[in-house]
Amino acid sequence: MNHQKSTTSGDDETDYFDAIHVDLFTAKILSKLPVKSIAQCRCVSKLWSSQIRRPYYNMLFPIMSPAPPRILFTIENAEGLFFYTSPQPRNPDENTSLVATLHHRTSGNSLLITSPPVGGLLCLEHDRKNYSRVLVISNPITGEFLALPKLRINEIKKELLYLNETYIFGYDPIDKQSKDAERHQWSKHIYQLPNRYLNKVVAAGVVGSSEIVFYRKYTREQDQFFIAYYNLESNIITRVILEVPLLFSGTCCVNAFTNYVGDVRLM
């Protein structure tokens, strides 16, 4: 910090200090807030918004106490697409119960989840009324949506002919080194689930190194919402009740993903 002096007409010396960098104070405040509060702080001022917009924000000013990974749920029915997250415990027992948090919802039922979240973002496929498809990147925490560039006419015609095309959502970190995946050693294990679970659940992902989380793909308003933890070491399935604020009715299509960490940066 530079120290400057100025002499007034009364020969009294007054000390003047250069203004302390405001962005450092802003970053200090933001670093103590939870992820969702940081997202809301983008509306405080242009300065605060520009801080969070920085590509290197998470590295320059990491959150002091980042929230642990959560389970991300999307629930879709005729009323829209709902985005929830819930705690992600390890080694739960039969007495464990979770409460899901609703973050936001979208109207309509023309959005399709194409792949697991990457960098806190989801890739959705939007089917338009003219039978064309548009890929949309969504932030489940902040509620932001970003439509990717439209396809050209010949590409749209190709999609109409080959409806089984698959979109893959990837993330390219800036100035990061990636390891060669071919050098990893893989092993194959076969586990047999109890018959009552075989055709009723799908995998959401792995928690830790030995627990797979399952959920029901389709559920109804009157059904009890639950997830199942399958311990690979003990071969035991633990059913965990999940309390979901129901803002919808009828049959719903569910997607779930483990190890979700939200991101507050603008897209």
Swiss-Prot record:
Superkingdom of the organism of origin = Eukaryota
Q: Which Pfam families match?
A: F-box
Check the record and name the InterPro entries matching this protein. Answer: F-box-like_dom_sf (IPR036047), F-box_dom (IPR001810)
F-box domain location is: 15-63
SUPFAM superfamilies, per the entry: F-box domain
Annotated coiled-coil segments of the chain: none
Q: What is this protein called?
A: Putative F-box protein At1g61060
User: What organism is recorded for this protein?
Assistant: Arabidopsis thaliana (Mouse-ear cress)
Could you read off the lineage of the organism from its UniProt record?
A: Eukaryota, Viridiplantae, Streptophyta, Embryophyta, Tracheophyta
